[in-house]
């Protein structure tokens, strides 16, 4: 099967979050499974700076963006058997960052038009075209409405993956003519209109042949008013083509037996290296080295979406216990300030690190006993899977991908891979935390068994790849 991915970011070239991880990993797994895979990404200035000497020029042409003719260069490299093509336009993509400009609508309108028009020119007409989030969600619409006259594109099947429904690409209807060069008919009849705006995500949901999300629970949640971001009724209407597939993690990169960022290696049969990493981490972040004290890790953006309003409200109660916490992250200044204040009050129990440090993050995943992740909503989440890979048991709010990946501790069977609570409140966070502490202190054999189950969980991309192939084969025989 010929499969083409079009996305706004993709590791290792450009990455701001989980979308970049998916684009960096899933195509590689599909190639391993025997398929011909290509990816189209914007050619950002950070790509030029880091990878420019590995990328070759292929061709260039002009793209009509409304009444304007814009330069489009095509560049190319091959990595892990995947051919990466880059759309080059320095005006749109040399901004020092991926998102956040006032003209993001124009930038990604150009990108989508250029990606479609590039397919013929690079001689890669896919059987299946996989687009991601609102930045590329207009492509299925454009293929069926603007480019339907191109015979080579007639049989292309499309999949839209929603990584985060909050970001929908809502713009003025004038964009249809001014940038995409199409009429207002589909806006006037309500197809593309939502809340009196042009809504790119709605267009993708309606025009893509299949819609996927990054976990089965999130696929269900976005059809509810609580998580549907005002598109729940549209998603309910299209529910027959909506499904969820849990993202994977790189099992080679996140491997406690070989991880180059760790001082000591270990496996599920011998955790002595984990204990040594714990002592090393405690020393590094300025906490007393205490082997018996439960060490809780947090690696996150400090935002309300991640549940930190509830964490801050619970923190004084938690720190009354014989426990240590190491936090790594940045975000809302109010939460940063709160954690910094608590670290001054409890210097032997809380280490607050308001920064981003890849090595420290990896050490937290590997060395801690418990990993706190009480997100208010979480489409998939990767940190909980990384933590489990290293035998660090997650404590999570049962939502989205957290519900799908963490098996809650069952005290009757002594089974599970972590701890979870359903109602996001200080009471239930504290109650679940107490359950975990009791198990850690008084039932070490059961705790050890949970660690082993967590480390044996399969979150590899090879597993996720099989689910995506089932989805693709439902469209392409």
Curated annotation (Swiss-Prot):
Q: Which InterPro entries match?
A: Glyco_trans_1 (IPR001296), GS/SS (IPR011835), Starch_synth_cat_dom (IPR013534)
Pathway annotation: Glycan biosynthesis; glycogen biosynthesis
- Top enzyme category: transferase
Which E.C. number(s) belong to this protein?
Answer: 2.4.1.21
In which residues is ADP-alpha-D-glucose bound? Answer: 15
Record bears the keyword Transferase: yes
Which keywords does UniProt give here? Glycogen biosynthesis, Glycosyltransferase, Transferase
So what does this thing catalyse? [(1->4)-alpha-D-glucosyl](n) + ADP-alpha-D-glucose = [(1->4)-alpha-D-glucosyl](n+1) + ADP + H(+)
Q: Name one GO biological process term.
A: glycogen biosynthetic process
Which Gene Ontology molecular function entries are recorded, alphabetically? alpha-1,4-glucan glucosyltransferase (ADP-glucose donor) activity; alpha-1,4-glucan glucosyltransferase (UDP-glucose donor) activity
Has keyword Chloroplast?
no
Role summary:
Synthesizes alpha-1,4-glucan chains using ADP-glucose.
Q: Which PANTHER family match?
A: ALPHA AMYLASE DOMAIN-CONTAINING PROTEIN, GRANULE-BOUND STARCH SYNTHASE 1, CHLOROPLASTIC/AMYLOPLASTIC
Family label: Belongs to the glycosyltransferase 1 family. Bacterial/plant glycogen synthase subfamily.
Q: What is this protein called?
A: Glycogen synthase
Q: Please report the organism this UniProt entry assigns to the protein.
A: Streptococcus pneumoniae serotype 19F (strain G54)
What is the phylogenetic placement of the source species in the record? Bacteria, Bacillati, Bacillota, Bacilli, Lactobacillales
């Amino acid at each position: 099967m010929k499969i083409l991915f079009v996305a706004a970011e993709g590791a290792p070239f450009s990455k701001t979050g989980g979308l970049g991880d998916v684009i960096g990993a899933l195509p590689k797994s599909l190639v391993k499974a025997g398929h011909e895979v290509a990816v189209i990404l914007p050619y950002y200035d950070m790509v030029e700076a880091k990878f420019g000497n590995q990328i070759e020029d292929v061709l260039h042409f002009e793209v009509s963006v409304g009444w304007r003719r814009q330069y489009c260069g095509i560049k190319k490299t091959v990595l892990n058997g995947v051919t990466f093509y880059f759309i080059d336009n320095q005006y749109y993509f040399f901004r020092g960052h991926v998102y956040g400009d006032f003209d993001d609508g124009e930038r990604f309108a150009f990108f989508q038009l250029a990606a479609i028009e590039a397919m013929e020119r690079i001689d890669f007409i896919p059987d299946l075209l996989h687009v991601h989030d609102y930045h590329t969600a207009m492509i299925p619409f454009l293929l069926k409405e603007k480019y339907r006259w191109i015979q080579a594109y007639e049989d292309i099947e499309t999949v839209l993956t929603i990584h985060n429904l909050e970001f929908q690409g809502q713009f003025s209807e004038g964009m249809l003519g001014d940038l995409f060069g199409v009429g207002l008919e589909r806006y006037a009849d309500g197809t593309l209109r939502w809340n009196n705006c042009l809504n790119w995500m709605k267009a993708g949901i309606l025009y893509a042949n299949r819609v996927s999300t990054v976990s089965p629970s999130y696929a269900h949640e976005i059809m509810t008013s609580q998580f549907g971001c005002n598109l729940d009724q549209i998603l309910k209407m299209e529910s027959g083509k909506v499904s969820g597939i849990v993202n994977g993690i790189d099992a080679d990169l996140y491997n406690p037996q070989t991880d180059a960022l760790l001082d000591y290696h270990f496996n599920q049969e011998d955790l002595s290296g984990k204990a040594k990493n714990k002592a090393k981490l405690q020393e590094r972040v300025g906490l007393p080295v205490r082997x018996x004290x439960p060490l809780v890790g947090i690696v996150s953006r400090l935002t309300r979406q991640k549940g930190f309003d509830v964490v801050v409200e619970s923190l004084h109660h938690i720190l009354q216990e014989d426990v240590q916490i190491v936090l790594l992250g940045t975000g809302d200044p109010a939460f940063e300030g709160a954690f910094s204040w608590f670290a001054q009050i409890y210097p032997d129990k809380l280490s607050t690190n308001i920064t981003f440090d890849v090595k420290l993050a990896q050490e937290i995943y590997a060395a801690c006993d418990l990993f706190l992740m009480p997100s208010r909503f979480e489409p998939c989440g990767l940190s909980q899977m990384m933590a489990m890979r290293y035998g660090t048991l997650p404590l999570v709010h049962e939502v989205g991908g957290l519900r799908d990946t963490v098996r809650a501790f069952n005290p009757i069977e002594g089974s599970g891979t972590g701890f979870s609570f359903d109602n996001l409140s200080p009471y239930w966070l504290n109650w679940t935390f107490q359950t975990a502490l009791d198990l850690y202190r008084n039932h070490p054999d059961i705790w050890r068994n949970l660690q082993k189950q967590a480390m044996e969980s399969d979150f590899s991309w090879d597993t996720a790849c099989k689910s995506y192939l089932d989805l693709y084969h439902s469209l392409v025989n």
